[in-house]
Amino acid sequence: MTGSGTPPSREVNTYYMTMTMTMTMIMIMTMTMNIHFNNNNNNNINMNSRRMYLFILM
């Protein structure tokens, strides 16, 4: 999180915890969106939304 140098281990652990929390939240959101869009048979929308979420993570 800091600009220069290596942060202490506590900040690294909180950083990876927040990253994994956001990863799991976005995966749950995409799974629920896929279930919601599969009822409407819009397969292009859920593939585009999953690709957009992965692009935002990068």
UniProtKB/Swiss-Prot annotation:
Compartment annotation: Mitochondrion
Domain of life: Eukaryota
One cellular-component annotation, GO: mitochondrion
Main location as per UniProt: mitochondrion
Keywords: Mitochondrion
The protein's name in its UniProt record: Putative uncharacterized protein Q0142, mitochondrial
Organism expressing this protein natively: Saccharomyces cerevisiae (strain ATCC 204508 / S288c) (Baker's yeast)
